[in-house]
Amino acid sequence: MLAACRPRPPAPLVPVPLAPVERDSAIAWARTTLPPTPTAIRFRWHYQDEHVKYAGRGTARIAPPDSMRFDYAGPLGLGSGAAVVIGDSVLWADPDKNFRSLVPAIPMLWAALGMIRPPAAEADVLGADLTDAGGAPRRVVWRFAQLGDTLDYLATDSAGRTVLLEAEWRRRGERVARSRTSLDARQRPASARIDFASGGARFELTVVAIDTATVIAPVLWRSRR
């Protein structure tokens, strides 16, 4: 009886079979999601799981094509930290545990900020255009799969631009995290949320400003310790 009351796991983001596509096409698409110049994205954030709730402000400084300095702070400076991400790897984080608790899935952080990491060299690349003839918004799907990990991306277009970017990470068939990002008229992130399967965790952010003329000082890439 108890088993019957358990909530069903969410359906896959992309519940349809996909065909292999050229890797170069996926790389070209991922490149279009990056800012053309170093950019600072300032946001309000909220995190909660089964045990805690936190909120505060943060800044993601992006140096395309693959580098990010991520700073966050809670109310009155409590719970502050920083990290540098290169591609899908954390170069350093301080405090390490706090950052990895806040954002345990780096590809999903990039996706939440409206940016897609290109497929790894050994990844299988699949895709589809789900546009139908009924006048519905165009939806384009990409899947990058390797070594038991699968990353699905679903981009919804309207009036010739992407307005919604969704992503899902599955490991050995089990969902790890799913993100949903609304984009503004310039296809930049406006708001986002990442839901994690473990512990009912959720990370949300609302963008308050985007500076496309920012200068990222070299010292910011170095560890704070």
Regions found by a protein language model. Name each.
Residues I116-A133:
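Surface-exposed beta-loop interaction hotspot
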Residues C5-A55, A63, S67, L102, ...:
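N-terminal leader/targeting segments and the immediate start of mature chains
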Residues A128-R225:
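Gly/Pro-enriched, hydrophobic low-complexity segments
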